[in-house]
């Protein structure tokens, strides 16, 4: 199925995209020059996008600054299976560009303070697990193995998916998207 320049393998993908397009706010809307940082790997990464609050000091690392209130929400959303799928349909499959981050929709105002606390807990749990399973190279760079923390990524999707109006079937589709590649050793 083809919509514009986007090609979908499954009909469910069009429904997910339509729900994302209903969201009128994007990450760009919460950029703040003096905000809190979110770090991301600009190149490589294959089947996972590693998004953290702490820099790795890699030459392939990018940074964006967002309003303090939304740092964990942005980090969690960009770590989600939903963002991975969104990135695949909008990218060259190799690089993570700031324009792809900026255009990702997040329904910021639909999250209550309690829900922001919950997403902060989910994201911190994921990051703690991610770091506990990471390795440091001889040159001092962190190597992450996100597939070992996938259950925490899935928990993020289950929580934020409802805010996009995604059905349980759509959330399961995203959680299992590219599963055979994303979980291979």
Locations of regions flagged by a protein language model:
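S-adenosyl-L-methionine
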Residues: 22-185
């Amino acid at each position: 199925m083809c919509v514009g320049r986007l090609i979908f393998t499954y009909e469910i993908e069009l429904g997910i995209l339509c729900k994302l397009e209903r969201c009128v706010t994007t990450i760009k809307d919460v950029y703040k020059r003096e905000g809190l940082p979110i770090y991301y790997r600009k190149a490589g990464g294959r089947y996972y996008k590693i998004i953290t609050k702490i820099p790795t000091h890699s030459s392939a690392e990018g940074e964006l600054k967002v309003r303090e209130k939304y740092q964990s929400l942005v980090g969690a959303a960009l770590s989600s299976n939903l963002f991975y799928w969104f990135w695949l349909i909008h990218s060259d499959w190799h690089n993570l560009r700031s324009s792809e981050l900026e255009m990702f929709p997040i329904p910021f105002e639909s999250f209550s303070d309690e829900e922001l606390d919950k997403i902060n807990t989910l994201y911190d749990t994921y990051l703690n697990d991610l770091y506990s399973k990471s390795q440091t190279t001889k040159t001092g760079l962190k190597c992450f193995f996100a597939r070992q923390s996938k259950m925490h990524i899935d928990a993020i999707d289950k929580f934020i998916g409802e805010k996009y109006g995604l059905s349980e079937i759509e959330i399961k589709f995203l959680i299992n998207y590219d599963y055979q590649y994303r979980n291979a050793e």
